[in-house]
Amino acid sequence: MCIRDRFPGSFGSAYLYYVVPRVILFREEHTARVFVNQVDFISAAGSNEVNVHRLGGPYALVTGRCLMRFDKGKKQFTLLSVHAGETVESVSENTGFYFDCPADVPETPSPHADVLRVLRGPIAEELAKTYPAFAERVFGGI
């Protein structure tokens, strides 16, 4: 399959990756279709040459399966934890790129009640103003 068109959607990311110190990426779908070994276009590179001044870049990746942290020195992700019901194997099988994996990977801790209250309250309400369909799907009736 040859991709010839570059589609919109990542307009600000190239700039933000240089100036925002800790960019946290999130994607609910965690499959090898989404997390491929090689992409057709790079909108915002995760790393750069040594002589390029850069304050920001990717910090973490949160998916429906796990939490990963980006290592700028190694220019790759490291698995930090797997969500309930997932395993290192299920994450690996559904990831098309190489990532570091420590010998012991814990389960992602569940959020505390006060965090859930804020997420389901003021954050969900604010999110619904810009992304109503997403907020409805994630939080239900707001």
Predicted regions and their residues:
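A conserved C-terminal secondary-structure "cap"
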Residues: 103-142
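Conserved phosphate- and dinucleotide-binding cores of soluble alpha/beta proteins
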Residues: 4-104, 111
